[in-house]
Amino acid sequence: METKDIIIIGGGAAGLMASCAAVHVLKKRGSVLVLEGNAKLGRKLLATGNGRCNLTNLNVSPAHYHGDVTVIQDLLHEYTPEAICAVFREMGLVTKPDSEGRVYPQNQQAAAVLSALRWDAEKYGVSFSEEHTVSKIEKVKNGFTLICTDGTQLFTKQCILTCGGAASPRHSCGEGYTLAKQLGHTVTKLYPSLTQLTVRAKQWKTLSGTRAPANAVLLADGKPVYEESGEVQFTDTGISGICVFGLSIYAGEFFALGTIRNKKYTSLAVQLDLLPDMAYQDVLDYLLEMTKLYPARAAGDLFSGLLNMRLGYMLVGVAGIAQSDPAVKIKAPQLKKLASLLKGWRLDITGTKDFSAAQVTAGGVPLTELDPHTMASKKAPGLYLAGEMLNIHGDCGGYNLHFAWASGITAGKSAAYRCLKEEKR
């Protein structure tokens, strides 16, 4: 049976960073192996940030995280965005923030991030084994026995679980939850986050592919609970876009648990202000002006100088106006309704897209079952956990990768120091 000092299960962001951190401590005084179930390491990492890899965010703080947030405050304090950027700079990767604080590699290529991690790990002796999926893990004397789906058995003194979550199943299948349970850990309710919202509306597919700037307000039982601004993308079944992803964090909680920020609610809707830079009266004045200037123009064309025409036609119909009616026929109350729709179009939310369309997983192994200063398991000595499989998920904008790096570094260092300590006994 092959034996290693440290085996890391999962070759994604947290796992690769853990391997680098571990070998820097060991300095070739121990062996580190990364097992990856996919054919290639870091597949999900390559897809992040539309292939540019949003590494971290200069605005990192506990306020941008959800789940067991109080447990990770010290971790975020120790591993600031500047500290993470410094780690990558030592690997030869230059980073650059954008105007909103999102940090990317200078060359805007996720492949450069993956290469930096792999080269650094290999330089100090990390070995990799791809297409190796661990199906069973057992705690034995002085370590762990790992059994792979192909029958291969391995022994390791320390084990780090960085298997990722259930989101993007093409890149991560979430087997880490099963392995964690085999060693006594629990897993909270899992649900998709940073994903599209589905809505209830007639003739919705006519909007598919349309984009518009908007202010989006999440309404729970009719009361605003969260809002974000940005570009909204209209899909076949609902809405998408970065600002919608922000809403999906809370919508996901609602549909999975019936709560938002742990408070019970019974209904969910989104209200879109499609003209966030204009006041209601300005919108109404514009509509009145258009009806006077172009009395023969079809109602559906009233918005041609103001809004995407497909949205204009949709809202005219929602207001109960025939799209082909001449503008002169539109009554004042109907114009007011149109203006109100433009400034506050309310749509009932029917759900979120599933894990296949989600960027991250909400829920996971509770951090209360770990020592947050080492990421060591309280259930199985010698076991460490990091990354998305834990009950922490962040906002869109580099926050989830930041936690992967920070927890990966902590787990890797801690496992390595434990190895060295055991050698001295």
Task: Annotate each predicted stretch with a short phrase.
Residues 130, 313-393:
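A glycine-rich dinucleotide-binding beta-alpha-beta segment and adjacent secondary-structure elements
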Residues 50-100:
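Glycine-rich active-site loop/strand segments that organize a redox cofactor
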Residues 7, 23-50:
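Glycine-rich FAD pyrophosphate-binding loop
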Residues 130-143:
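A conserved short coil-to-beta-strand element within the FAD-binding core of flavoproteins
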Residues 2-4, 148-158, 227-229:
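Core beta-strand elements of the Rossmann-like FAD/NAD(P) dinucleotide-binding domain
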Residues 39-41, 55-61, 186-189, 198-329:
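An anion/pyrophosphate-binding glycine-rich loop and adjacent beta-alpha core
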Residues 1-14, 33:
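Beta1/beta-strand and adjacent pyrophosphate-binding region of the FAD-binding site
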Residues 7-9, 35, 134, 153-172, ...:
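Short hydrophobic core segments
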